C-alpha cells in the first residue's frame, strides 16, 4: 500500500513539476501566438495627380463624403457592436514623400491592438522598422516595410478621440 501511495505521489509530483516548469519556460509565447496583431484596415492611401479632383470624382460618382483629407468610413466593431470603428480613405499628391522609402503609389494602414508589444515582436522577428511609435490623441502610429518594399502604417486607434476630431473638422462619415 505504501509503495502504491509513493508511486502515485511521485507521478502527481512529476506532473505538477512539469506543468510548473512548462508554464515558466513558455510563459508569454502562447500569449504572443494568440495575440491578435491586426484587427482591421485603418486606412487606404494612394498617390494621384490631383487629389482635389479625385476626391470630387469619388464624391460625385460614388457618394463619398469628402473633405481635405479624403473620406472616413464608419463601421461597428465585431467584438463589440456598440463601439464604432473608422477607416480613412485618402488620395495623396503624386509628389508626396509620406510613402517613402517605398517607391509604391499606395500605403495601407492596419488597425492593431497593443502597438508597443507588436512593435517589439516585429523587431525581434527582423521586420524592417522605419521609425519609432508616435502618440496622438486619436492613437499611436508606427511604420514598417513588408518584404516587397511596401510601407505599412500601424495604428492603435483611439476611436472616440478620432471621432471627436472628425466632428471638429466637420467630417461626415460614410456609414
Where are these predicted regions, by residue range?
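Positively charged n-region of N-terminal signal peptides that target proteins for export
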Residues: 1-4
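Hydrophobic membrane-insertion alpha-helices, especially the h-region
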Residues: 10-18
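Vicinal oxygen chelate
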Residues: 17, 22-49, 68-69, 96-175
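Core segments of cupin and vicinal oxygen chelate
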Residues: 35-39, 45-90
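Residue-level signal for short segments within beta-strands and strand-turn junctions
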Residues: 77, 93, 156-158
Amino acid at each position: 500500500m505504501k509503495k502504491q501511495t509513493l508511486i502515485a505521489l511521485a507521478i502527481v509530483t512529476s506532473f505538477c513539476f512539469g506543468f510548473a516548469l512548462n508554464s515558466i519556460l513558455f510563459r508569454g509565447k502562447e500569449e504572443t501566438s494568440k495575440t491578435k496583431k491586426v484587427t482591421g484596415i485603418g486606412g487606404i492611401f494612394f498617390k494621384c495627380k490631383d487629389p482635389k479632383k479625385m476626391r470630387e470624382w469619388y464624391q460625385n460618382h460614388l457618394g463619398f463624403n469628402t473633405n481635405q483629407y479624403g473620406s472616413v468610413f464608419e463601421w461597428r466593431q465585431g467584438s463589440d457592436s456598440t463601439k464604432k470603428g473608422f477607416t480613412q480613405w485618402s488620395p495623396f499628391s503624386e509628389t508626396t514623400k509620406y510613402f517613402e522609402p517605398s517607391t509604391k503609389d499606395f500605403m495601407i494602414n492596419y488597425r492593431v491592438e497593443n502597438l508597443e508589444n507588436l512593435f517589439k515582436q516585429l523587431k525581434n522577428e527582423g521586420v524592417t522598422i522605419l521609425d519609432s511609435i508616435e502618440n496622438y490623441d486619436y492613437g499611436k502610429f508606427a511604420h514598417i516595410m513588408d518584404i516587397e518594399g511596401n510601407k505599412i502604417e500601424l495604428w492603435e486607434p483611439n476611436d472616440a478621440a478620432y471621432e471627436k476630431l472628425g466632428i471638429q473638422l466637420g467630417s461626415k462619415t460614410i456609414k
